[in-house]
Amino acid sequence: MFNTSTFVYIATTADTKGQELEYVRQIIANLGLPTVTVDLSTSSLPANPAADICAEEVAGYHPEGARAVFCPNRSHAITAMALAFERFLLTRHDIAALLGLGGSGGTAIITPAMQKLPIGLPKLMVSSMAAGDVSVYVGNSDIAMLYSVTDIAGLNRISRRVLSNAACQIAGAVRFATAHDIEEKPAVGLTMFGVTTPCIKMVVSALEPQWDCLVFHATGSGGRALEKLIDSRLLSAALDLTTTEVADYLFGGVLPCNEERFSAIARTGIPCILSCGALDMINFGPPETVPARYAERLIHQHNPQVTLVRTTPQENASIGRWIGEKMNACSGEVRFVIPGGGVSALDAPGQPFWDPQALAAFMQALESTLRPTNKRRLIKTAYHINDPRFAHIVTEQFQHIANPRLLSK
């Protein structure tokens, strides 16, 4: 059921896209939904009458005032308006959905603010930039990107169809939103890769009766999404068992985390179990994309689009030290559980990445770096990460540090 006290916000640079703004506004209004239109123009032209909220009002939310937005440097103006729009949106408590229309500049202004909106609130960006790599625009959010096909520069037979579809999509997301019951179980985030899937499935199966289990694909963006939800207090605990993104970050893979990995756990103090899932590999695309410096290394083609380079003992030691320092910043309950029998499906006897020396180097570096406390501990096992006995130990340790009855309150 639609909340009549909320509005579909429509944002664009109305100095160049006022016609398109009015077109989608009218469609949404005809579908029975109230709208608020927002002008994000960075030119110094007079206020556009097509918008309910003028660019000057939005620009006033910049920490340095509107003058920071309306400046001669277009790049600076776009960056400043993006910050102003982000701060403007955070003051609005009547947003049912956000529809953005933009080219490169408009998309750069609108999407950072979209990323700050709650996950689950409909957000759709119609953009001429949506046919390429949109990761910088989407970030860790659930923004939907719709390619405009033609530039958003007037109404024509193509743009009318695309914009009409966008208006109907955002209206449908609002009008036909599914009612969600309040989830009484606390939420826990888990990280998984294909080569650690058996472990995660066993842990999820054991925890599901008491926990709402959210599994994140450890592809760089997955880890960042996990961290965002931890910082947003939408997760009560974490089982970050697949930390492969660290290898890509340190050694140039294509699925890296960033320097902030594990920092949300330290900031919030939520209970967490860590492990070294899939730290035996650095991820690349097709074989021809593997850097020349890795040409003589042990390489495994996982599928036509994914090529894996085996990490060396020296690299694993570097990873161990890096994670150890991150753990030292944690003041909450945190455990690192070592799967001494191998860290992935490929790191097992008879498999291509089996290398006990590499795992030993990781363990030694982690242990020598970590400063244990009564809350921060290292736990060694002899089992492979996908062994049911390892999953049992992980689950048991988690249950020691995370009480779902307390965390659900």
UniProtKB/Swiss-Prot annotation:
Species of provenance: Serratia proteamaculans (strain 568)
PANTHER family membership: UPF0261 DOMAIN PROTEIN (AFU_ORTHOLOGUE AFUA_1G10120)
Disulfide bonding pattern of the chain: none
Protein name stated in the entry: UPF0261 protein Spro_4740
Sequence similarity: Belongs to the UPF0261 family.
Top-level taxon of the source organism: Bacteria
NCBIfam families to which the protein is assigned, alphabetical: PRK02399.1-1 (NF002673), PRK02399.1-2 (NF002674)
Pfam families: UPF0261, UPF0261_C
